[in-house]
Amino acid sequence: MDVAFPGMERHDEKNPPGDDGTKPTGGKKARPAIKIKWYWKGLILLVELCIGDYLLDRYVFGGVMLRTTIAYAVLARVGLDYKLHYGKDCWLARHPEEDLHHRNAQRVCTMLKWNGGLYLKAGQAVAMQGSVLPEEYQRMFGEMFDDAPHSSWSDVEKVIKQDFGGRSIEDVFGVAPSDQQGDSQFVFEREPRASASIAQVHYARLPDGRGLAVKVQRREISKQVSWDLWSMKLMTEYTAWVTGLPMGGMGQFVADRVMQETDFEHEASNSEKMADLIATDSSLRDRVYIPKVYREFTSKRVLTTEWVDAVQLWDRDAITGQVAPSRSATSDKPGLGLRLDDVMRTVVELFSAQMFSWGFVHCDPHPGNILVRQNPKRPDSAQVVLLDHGLYITMSDKLRRQYARFWKALVTNDDASLQRVSREWGMKSADAWADASLMRPYKNPSSSDDESGESWQRTKETPEERKQRMIDEAAAYLGDEGLFPRELLFLERNITIVQGNNRFLGSPVNRIKLIGSCALKAIRDDGQGKESIRERISTRVALLSLDLAFWWSAMKQYFGYGEGLEQELKEAEDRQLRETKDAVAELFGITVN
């Protein structure tokens, strides 16, 4: 029943009148506006920002932010795991050390391999001198020299097209890509023969019969490396600011040198320059070989050299194995029938010539970059093939001569000359750099009288005084920033890796004597003063003492009472490292096991 009130009009509920009082003819009822709570708006905005950042990071910055986030997350997880389950003061239940080290080493190694680039290079550096880490880490980090994860074939094609004006692989090399491996076909193999931190190597065989090693850079590596180096530079500057150590400019110096590795045209120039230098040395020109660079197939991100069949430096069985008369169905590769001492002598003399004679030093001599083959002219002797010429330093003549005098003073125990060179480098003490160069403690006889008194004084130190003393000692090691030659960082890296190679092969040569002899030869060739008869006798006695130490160690090794001179030096170094662990824990609050 309808009821009407005065002054009111009845309207149809389903079709209310419009603003002008007219009744609409039809249509649905208007829905009220939906009001979104503020926290939903914030969540939607956050999701949009995350998606936008991810797409920007992946397609513009090469995934650098994701890689950095993963690295920090893994390291934070490892640190938390040790805080929770390691040591007497752990926060939760204590876990067995082997299990704890194993799972965290696995986490770190997986992260390094996945991130690639400089992360993988860092893992290789730790693997070369990993005695500061637990045994589980050393085993895991040993895998860093295995083939790294390789780029997809589509990425390889994109890099070659971009660097060669849009031309395809068939147009550039004149051969078609193939999934088959072998030397009988004229192909460009899709599957890489080797994969490293910033590039991978494909084999190609041209119609004219030339075998090529085509090194193709990872597509996003230039963006990733620049970000990684920027992060490293910030950490270096932060450490310098916190501790007061004179190392603020080192981060930029290292970053500039490592960035050169991403320019393969620069690497090609380094390779050709090293080949020219070796050709001028009559003692090395037949014992060392640098693969020829093909400039017509080389660009900023593609390096093409001749293919050289050889074995890696650490493949002892292949180097020393008997030469097979012919390949059998079961033999993978016949031995070369070479002597390890012949190989390592060439390696040590090559890098010594770079440091003391040429001033142009290869700074990444890890075993993957050193191959060994039979000398084409004398098959019974070894020829070393040097690869990967991206990371070099150029020494000034002044620094080259100083470094030669530094090593002469080391092998002849000439403390006065050692301190004189160190002062020229802005160092307060030469002992630390002597330890690092020799890979063993360098004992300064003049300090022995004060040793007991200094030890007694250190027992009375407060934690703050001990921390300040360690900072002062580190500052003395690094020297005055304006005088300290930053090239020494890479020189010591070279020395350390060569020492590791010699130790792995069982110390076949007296490395310290060989380096010292090359330094003495360079000093004579440069005419840096004439030696008196007394100095000559002193030098010969010092070299003879090194020979006696080497042969005594070799004799013990032969009868099963040792593992060679380098291993004995390594044990002395390990004792120093144990002291360093305590110092690091005191200085930075980091427990290194």
Curated annotation (Swiss-Prot):
Sequence segments annotated as region (Disordered): 1-29, 441-467
Function according to Swiss-Prot or TrEMBL: ABC1 family protein; part of the gene cluster that mediates the biosynthesis of the lipopeptide antibiotics leucinostatins that show extensive biological activities, including antimalarial, antiviral, antibacterial, antifungal, and antitumor activities, as well as phytotoxic. The function of lcsO within the leucinostatins biosynthesis has not been identified yet.
PANTHER family (alphabetical): ABC1 FAMILY PROTEIN, ABC1 FAMILY PROTEIN C10F6.14C
Signal sequence interval, chain numbering: none
Pfam families: ABC1 (PF03109)
CDD domains membership: ADCK1-like
Listed InterPro entries: ABC1_dom, ADCK1_dom, Kinase-like_dom_sf, Mito_struct-func_regulator
Coiled-coil zones: none
Record's note on what induces expression: Expression is positively regulated by the leucinostatins biosynthesis cluster-specific transcription regulator lcsF.
Source organism of the structure: Purpureocillium lilacinum (Paecilomyces lilacinus)
Ranges annotated as biased composition (Basic and acidic residues): 8-22, 457-467
Protein family (similarity comment): Belongs to the protein kinase superfamily. ADCK protein kinase family.
Name under which the protein is recorded: ABC1 family protein lscO
